[in-house]
């Protein structure tokens, strides 16, 4: 790995700075995040069809293939009483455009690695972790000016 780091002018570990995560409220936020993740290759212009992207779980969530490594989330299972109804409901969700506001919110929570969900969820995370789980402003507070 040291040779690769020298060759490419990198420092640190190979995965340093690449992995980001945030806690997600199960209610409706899980499916919003599913859509965000599975539509990322489309936004990045890697594919026109998210189900065709090799490293995506989209084709499994649409019932087009089985993947033994995936465990369906209860929110996804609640989309329908059988696999066909779930697949159709998920296809409808994927076809709905994500609002710019939702995209920005997910990106900000992910970048800051903060809890994404309703206020009650963030309050619960605050209480259990004894740490602030909300979004912080992107600027540093000004220092008070010296008094003459």
PLM feature spans:
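Short Pro-Cys-Gly-centered "Cys-loop" motif that presents a nucleophilic cysteine in a tight turn
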Residues: 1-148
């Amino acid at each position: 790995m040291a040779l690769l780091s020298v060759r490419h002018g990198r420092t640190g570990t190979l995965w340093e700075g690449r992995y980001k995560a945030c806690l997600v409220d199960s209610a409706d936020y899980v499916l919003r995040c599913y859509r965000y993740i599975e539509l990322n290759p489309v936004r990045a212009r890697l594919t026109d069809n998210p189900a065709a992207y090799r490293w995506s779980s989209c084709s499994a969530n649409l019932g087009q293939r089985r993947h033994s490594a995936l465990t369906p989330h209860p929110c996804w299972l609640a989309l329908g009483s059988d696999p066909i109804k779930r697949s159709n409901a998920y296809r409808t969700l994927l076809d709905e455009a994500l609002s710019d506001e939702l995209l920005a919110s997910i990106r900000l929570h992910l970048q800051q690695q903060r809890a994404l969900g309703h206020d009650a969820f963030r309050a619960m995370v605050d209480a259990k972790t004894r740490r602030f789980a909300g979004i912080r402003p992107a600027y540093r507070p000004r220092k008070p000016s010296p008094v003459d």
